[in-house]
Amino acid sequence: MVNVKVEFLGGLDAIFKKQRVHKLTLKKNNSDDEPVTVGDLIDYIVENMIEDKNDVEVFLQNGTVRAGILTLINDTDWELEGEKEYELEDGDIISFTSTLHGG
């Protein structure tokens, strides 16, 4: 089990009931011992936090975070941390920031 803070910034909060910050407690397969990964977090977000399933494509594309969304793990680009394979730790802050803006 792991406690993390998840932030949706740059307008992404619009698909999450306009709430920018969420505190989550996650378990993998109802096990307290198995590590929870960022991939598990993304699955949880898609399955439980996006109300309108038509909005999933705003966040996800081809099974991963959509291009144009900067993903940070504790202020470090997730590509440097192993992307979806990163094992979450208590107190981690995962930020998703849309860099795409209409105009």
Swiss-Prot record:
Coiled coil: none annotated. The modification 1-thioglycine is found at G103. Pathway: tRNA modification; 5-methoxycarbonylmethyl-2-thiouridine-tRNA biosynthesis. Its main location: cytoplasm. Pfam families: Urm1. Keywords: Cytoplasm, Isopeptide bond, tRNA processing, Ubl conjugation pathway. GO terms for molecular function: protein homodimerization activity; protein tag activity; sulfur carrier activity. C-terminal thiocarboxylation occurs in 2 steps, it is first acyl-adenylated (-COAMP) via the hesA/moeB/thiF part of UBA4, then thiocarboxylated (-COSH) via the rhodanese domain of UBA4. GO terms for biological process: cell budding; cellular response to oxidative stress; invasive growth in response to glucose limitation; protein urmylation; tRNA wobble position uridine thiolation. One of its GO terms (cellular component) is cytosol. There is a cross-link at G103 (Glycyl lysine isopeptide (Gly-Lys) (interchain with K-? in acceptor proteins)). It is found in: Cytoplasm. Belongs to the URM1 family. Acts as a sulfur carrier required for 2-thiolation of mcm(5)S(2)U at tRNA wobble positions of cytosolic tRNA(Lys), tRNA(Glu) and tRNA(Gln). Serves as sulfur donor in tRNA 2-thiolation reaction by being thiocarboxylated (-COSH) at its C-terminus by the MOCS3 homolog UBA4. The sulfur is then transferred to tRNA to form 2-thiolation of mcm(5)S(2)U. Prior mcm(5) tRNA modification by the elongator complex is required for 2-thiolation. Also acts as a ubiquitin-like protein (UBL) that is covalently conjugated via an isopeptide bond to lysine residues of target proteins such as AHP1. This is Ubiquitin-related modifier 1. The lineage of its organism: Eukaryota, Fungi, Dikarya, Ascomycota, Saccharomycotina. The gene is URM1.
